[in-house]
From Swiss-Prot:
Belongs to the radical SAM superfamily. Lipoyl synthase family. It comes from Bartonella tribocorum (strain CIP 105476 / IBS 506). This is Lipoyl synthase. Residues 1-29 are annotated as: Disordered. [4Fe-4S] cluster 1 binds at C59, C64, C70, S298. [4Fe-4S] cluster 2 binds at C85, C89, C92. Keywords: 4Fe-4S, Cytoplasm, Iron, Iron-sulfur, Metal-binding, S-adenosyl-L-methionine, Transferase.
Amino acid sequence: MVTVVDRVTNRRLRHPEKAHRPDTSVQKKPDWIRVKAPTSPVYKETHGIVRTHKLVTVCEEAGCPNIGECWSQRHASFMILGEICTRACAFCNVATGIPLAVDDDEPERVADAVARMELKHVVITSVDRDDLADGGAEHFAKVIYAIRRKAPKTTIEVLTPDFRHKDGALEVVVAAKPDVFNHNLETVPSKYLKVRPGARYFHSIRLLQRVKELDPTIFTKSGIMVGLGEERNEILQLMDDLRTADVDFMTIGQYLQPTRKHHPVIRFVPPEEFESFAKIGKVKGFLHMASNPLTRSSHHAGDDFAILQKARDEKFALQR
């Protein structure tokens, strides 16, 4: 995911707000979590394109375990609006601090990268920009419009912040007509004060519901991490809340602790439990479920979009 400002190079300064916290041990990952180090020529080529365009990827910033697989298939997700977030979530490895000014040239450069990489599907995300009057909504829209001009065959997925206290911001993004609107709940409501203190659970639910009210043709999507100390019944209730908001697609993945200063992993959830959540989600009415220890919001996003389209077509066919 992409921005064109200079990267944060001093990792010790990435999370100044966490410096006072005691270290917590980082648990050894189970075998089902481990992935191979990236070595393919296509991975190196993708890495070169990212560097040539002076882009910063959330794949790197967030320490995503799937970077080798995704970049080897030339899949990329771009992070706009800088690399410094105004919030300090306990799970996230993206740098926290005072962001730089918005780069007005960024939409065109992101679109150029999408066109050059010949992406069939692209994910656009951002850091939280509580410092901006619209939370960065207009910039999201400009990126979408730029991609439509330079890569008209590419389908577009946005993964947005919550635009809390930003009246009219959501409407700006929806009016730009992304194909998929994703906003992650991240965790169950009982964990928000500790894990996602700057957000409000039911505000996020309402945001997703409002997207469907504004434009029913846009697929809606949300995801959570497990292993933060949540209970199974809380996850099932969260699924019901998402379905009440008419969300089409849900992702569930294992939380991995970025550093000793971040929220500890309470539990590594075994693969069979993820499979169980996927089956339950389908019964509850989601068009698609991606539930796997290594599942992340943008993982296999292009393939998932094709599945969503097919599932919706089949659903409408049955209703005729």
